[in-house]
Regions:
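Short Gly/Pro-enriched turn/cap motifs at secondary-structure boundaries
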Residues: 3, 14-15, 46-51, 100-106, ...
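Glycine-rich beta-strand-centered segment in the early N-terminal region that forms part
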Residues: 14-30, 42-85, 127-129
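Glycine-rich Rossmann-fold phosphate-binding loop(s) that bind the pyrophosphate
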Residues: 61, 140, 163-169
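NAD(P)H dinucleotide-binding glycine-rich loop of Rossmann-like/cofactor-binding domains
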Residues: 81-158, 162
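Hydrophobic/small residue at the entry helix of a nucleotide-binding pocket
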Residues: 143, 167, 175
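Conserved S-adenosyl-L-methionine
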Residues: 177-182
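Conserved acidic E/D residue at the C-terminus of a beta-strand in Rossmann-like folds
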Residues: 186-187
Length: 187
C-alpha cells in the first residue's frame, strides 16, 4: 500500500467482492508507470494501491458477462463512454467518463475488482503465446500509438524522439515499424 515514495507497506486487505457485470481478477503482472512514482500526483489520495498496467486471470465473472473463470486478460483502467462528442470524434482521452473509471484496488495486489463499466469494454483477451509481463506493455504502447497517430508519424517522415525511457523506446520501435526515417532519438 502506497503512503508516500518512502513509505510503501505490505498489508492484508479483504478479497474484493464483485457484483453483476463485474470481474474478479487474479493479478499476474502489473507494470510500473511513471505516474506511479510522482509523489505530488498521489499524496492527496493516500493510502492507495497503485498499478494500472495489469494482466491477469479471471477468477470470477459476475452475472451477465460472457467471460469465464480462467481466461487470461489484460485490463484497461480508464474506459471512455464511446457516446459523447469527444468519443465520437476520436478524442476518447478527453471523455468525461474516462477519468471516472478505474479498478479497485490498483494492480499492485493479488486480486482486484473490475467494475461493470470497465468490464463492458476494457477487457482484452490474451493469447497463450503472450506472457503476462509482455501484456503489461499494452497500455503504454496504446499511449504511444495514439501519440504517433496524432503526430502523423508515417513511412518516410522524419521523427525525433526526445527521451529514451520506456515510452521513448516504444516510440522508437513503433516509428521504425511504420518506416519513419530518418529516425533520431536522444536521451
Amino acid at each position: 500500500v502506497y503512503y508516500s515514495n518512502r513509505d510503501i507497506r505490505i498489508e492484508e486487505r479483504p478479497l474484493p467482492q464483485i457484483g453483476a457485470g463485474e470481474l474478479l481478477i487474479r493479478v499476474e503482472a502489473s507494470g510500473i508507470c511513471g505516474s506511479d512514482v510522482m509523489e505530488w500526483y498521489r499524496k492527496d489520495r493516500v493510502p492507495l494501491i497503485l498499478g494500472h498496467e495489469v494482466a491477469g486471470v479471471i477468477e470470477e465473472a459476475g452475472s451477465g458477462l460472457r467471460y469465464k473463470k480462467g481466461e487470461r486478460v489484460a485490463l484497461i483502467h480508464h474506459v471512455p463512454c464511446l457516446k459523447c462528442p469527444y468519443c465520437l470524434s476520436g478524442h476518447e482521452t478527453t471523455c468525461e467518463t474516462l477519468r471516472k473509471t478505474n479498478f479497485d484496488p490498483g494492480g499492485f495486489c493479488e486480486f482486484l475488482r473490475f467494475p461493470e463499466i470497465n468490464a463492458s469494454c476494457g477487457v482484452l483477451p490474451l493469447p497463450d503465446s503472450l506472457s503476462f509481463d509482455a501484456a503489461t506493455f499494452i497500455e503504454p504502447l496504446a499511449c504511444v500509438l495514439r501519440g504517433q497517430r496524432i503526430a502523423g508519424v508515417q513511412k518516410g517522415k522524419s521523427v525525433l524522439i526526445i527521451g529514451s525511457g520506456i515510452a521513448g523506446v516504444l516510440h522508437i520501435h513503433l516509428a521504425a515499424f511504420v518506416g519513419a526515417q530518418p529516425l533520431v532519438a536522444t536521451d
